[in-house]
Amino acid sequence: AAPREWLHVLGVSQLTWAVYLSAIQRGIRANVNEEFTVSFDSASPYMMAGRFQQYAITPHISGNMDDWVLRHQLLPMGYAVANAKKTQPFPQSSPVANKLSLQDFNPRRGQFDVKTTDDLSDEVLCNHNVYVYLRAFRDANEAVFKRDGVAAQELKDACSFIESLFAMKDWQSALELRKESLQAILNREPVSDIDSDIER
C-alpha cells in the first residue's frame, strides 16, 4: 500500500495541542516518512467574529501554562461608540485591524440602528482573529522547539517524549506509562468561556 502522507485534525484551538501535533509530525518525519505532514484547523476565529462579535487577544507565551490560552473580548459596539467624538483605536494589534478605529468598525451611526457594525466589520474581525491564532500557534511552537524557547520544561519534555515514540519498538507500553502526565498538561491549559461554548 502507498504510504500515508497527511494527517489532518479538526477543531484545534488549544496551544498545547498545537505543539503536541508538531511533535507528532517531527517524530514521524525523523523515523518513518520525512514527507509526512500533520495539520489542523479551528473554527473558533470565525465563530468568535461572526457569532459572538469577539476579537482575539494575543497571548503572552511564557513558561507559565496559565498564559497559554487564547482569550477573547467583546468588540465595543453601539450608538455611543459609533458616534464618539474622539476616535478610538482598535483594542488589539494585527496588520489589518491596526489601520481601523472602533468607529470604522461601527459605521452605522443612526439612532435607531440595531446593529452598528456591518459586513466589512465582520470580515476584518475574522481577519484579525485568524492572524492572532496563527501567530500564537507559531509562537507556541517556537517556545517549545527552539533551543532557547521559553516554554515550561515539563512541556518541552512531553513533546520530546512524543517525538521519541516513533523510534520505539514497544511504543504502546511507553505511551501507556506517560499518557496520564501528557493529558495532565493538556488539562492545565485554560480554555476560555467562548471555546467551551463552541465545544459544547
List each language-model region with its residue ranges.
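Glycine-rich phosphate/ribose-binding loops and adjacent secondary-structure elements
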Residues: 1-104
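C-terminal extensions of enzymes
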Residues: 71-200
